Amino acid sequence: QEDPDYLKLWLDSFVSSYEQFLDVDFEKLPTRVDDVPPGISLLPDNILQVLRLQLLQCVQKMSDGLEEQQQALSLLLVKFFIILCRNLANVEEIGMCSYVNHVITITTSYIQQLKSKTKEKEETDQTPIEEFVRHALVFCESLYDPYRNWRQRIAGHFLSTVERSRQKYKPASLTVMFVPFFYQCFQESEHLKESLKCCLLHLFGAIVAGGQRNALQAVSPATMEVLMRVLADCDSWDDRNPEEESRKAELTLKCLTEVVHILLTSSSDQRQVETSTILENYFKLLNSDHSALPNPKRCRQWESRFIALQIQMLNTITAMLDCTDRPVLQAIFLNSNCFEHLIRLLQNCKVFQGHLDSLAVSTIQALTAVMHKSPAAKEVFKERIGYAHIYEVLKSLGQPSRELLEELMNMAVEGDHMAVGMLGISNVQPLLLLIQWLPELESHSLQVFISNWLRRICCINRQSRATCVNANMVIRVIETLNSHSALHSSCAENLIALLGSLGSQSMSSEELLQLIRLLRTEEPDRAHPYVVPVMRSILAMARKQGMASALQYFNLKHSMAGIAVPSIHKWPGSAFSFNAWLCLDQDRVDPSMSSKSGKRKQLY
């Protein structure tokens, strides 16, 4: 305390010895080192008090501007605290002291300088100030996300609940200065470097990922306003740092995903912001009207970047719904009128010249995520929007790509459409849409590809055939075959083979009549090209294949399905029996059940 030069020398030596623990780059995972920095008890007596006074002196001199030596000392102090926090046993004690408040005060002043556009700033080297800011933000990360959960998440490593429960040390309590600091940093920040904004977003994500208590304190109306404004600022993107701009948007969306997940695990009295409010602002931004922008701003390059942002936002919806409380979040999405917003996005995107297909693919992915394994969501979509409407909207975008058609196939099986045999039909409506779209496809190769896949997925087992028959697929196929001049011969053969398989399951007299009418020609002397394949189909329907099976049966596939036997009021004896035939369909293997024990149905 009496010899500042010796103190600086000691700090230099300490920081040099443990420099590998600094890990200032948020984009990189922390360095794994066997050794750890010393605990506080092993440091010289009163060293923390001395350092606190040194920091306080720096704060007091900020108004007049720090000299070069004082700037170097303040940076050394922050590095020292980062290193100390890498010994997780020190985090709680350091967090309880006033160091972080002093550091935030200095950082706020520096960021104000970096945000300004003055001649003095342009003539002065800003590197020392930027270096301090980066280290200050990492110091805060060390306090509030000691296990670097956010960095793990950014790198694609998702920690399970069990792994999180094994984290022995808790993060320090979040300082009340953080929310005002974070909000102020993004006020009038057009001259602040995008890389520093990314660091601020990294810190926010780290606080939310570090622990629920701090997350609920950080997730406030002010911070949510900042995140939404960062996304909305895409209008002012320039050509100087497009990669950093894109990364900023990506980090903001990852922060929002983390926020939604943390809000789902909290009670209403703990939350400052409701998930529904976030989604309302999110969809409003996703569907914002940019047609009023002046033409110079709406250049082709700007359109490309804006659509890229919309695609990122759509993909984020899928990421948000990838959580343990998915049914709860799906209900919140439904209450936020997400289907209407997503369909409106497809309708409005026609103002742009290109990238329509990519946007349509991402929109279908988002719709699939909202409806995934939720009969209620599927019913809501059917009632509010309807597949006839989405068909018209998609058709208005022009000829579809293979990727878009494959996404509709994925929607039908709620998984990878190539896993035929592993996945059955979860949503039959997209299949009807694909059948209806076949005559409109100019590409014959796409017609053959789609029809061949439809034939395989719809006929894979008894359950799939029953699902398709109950959805009136037979009539839809016959209607499509009526446009035979627009269909490739192989496509027509696949559809007729599909008819034969579905007809062997069930076919009404009206459907059979429609099939026969299909063979009429305007010229009596010329046979219809479908005569031979249709006759084969009719023979396949009539032919008995395998063991005779019941024409009517109960479907007990659903986990909650069962047969209720009426209660017996008077027992004829000591017990009673209930007889039923059981048919086990072995064609379908559910991958989700492959690693689990078998299910058992009980009779109540």
What function would you assign to each model-found segment?
Residues 87, 531-535, 558-604:
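Extracellular glycan-recognition modules
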